Design a protein with these regions (language model features):
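Active-site beta->alpha loop and helix N-cap motifs at the rims of alpha/beta catalytic domains
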Residues: 2-155
Length: 156
């Protein structure tokens, strides 16, 4: 398991490299794996020490489930453990986060980047329980906490 002591240098937050038709309301499969590969290789080649994807650029709530799975699996395969890879798995409820973590756990990704479900205000105790539940269910995944008090409706 990775710890914060193992992480250093530059962390690149990678967008979900989209296909040309991604803005079309009828579009599906809008992840460009070719662009993702070029972008990920460029970030690592330019010196990124850690990569994070599907974070708060909007991917966690705008990608279709199959698109999320495509970007997770492709990013892990392309990265091939060259640098630590944290995959965003935030969701609007714990069940969705668990489903996303299960997908990430099937890959070579280092861990997950997760903010608490935030549709309704929460408490520090609930947030801690949420992260504990994720850690207990996915002991092989490192967890990077994404903490944004104004957005997540809780301050830790």
């Amino acid at each position: 398991m990775i710890s914060s002591a193992d992480l250093g240098g530059l962390m690149a937050m990678m967008p979900a490299f989209a296909t040309d038709d991604a803005a079309d309301i009828h579009a599906t499969n809008t992840i460009s794996v070719k662009r993702l590969e070029a972008g990920l290789n460029r970030m690592i080649g330019d010196g990124a020490n850690v990569i994070a994807t599907t974070g708060s650029f909007g991917e966690f709530h705008t990608l279709l489930p199959e698109e999320y799975e495509t970007i997770v699996r492709a990013a892990a395969e392309i990265n091939d453990r060259r640098v630590p890879l944290f995959v965003g798995a935030t969701g609007l409820n714990t069940r969705e986060v668990m489903r996303k973590c299960a997908i990430v756990a099937e890959t070579s990704a280092t861990g997950v980047l997760i903010g608490v479900p935030f549709y309704f205000p929460s408490s520090p105790a609930n947030a801690i329980r949420f992260y504990r539940d994720i850690a207990e269910n996915f002991p092989t995944l490192g967890i990077m906490i994404h903490h944004n008090p104004p957005l997540h409706n809780v301050k830790l």
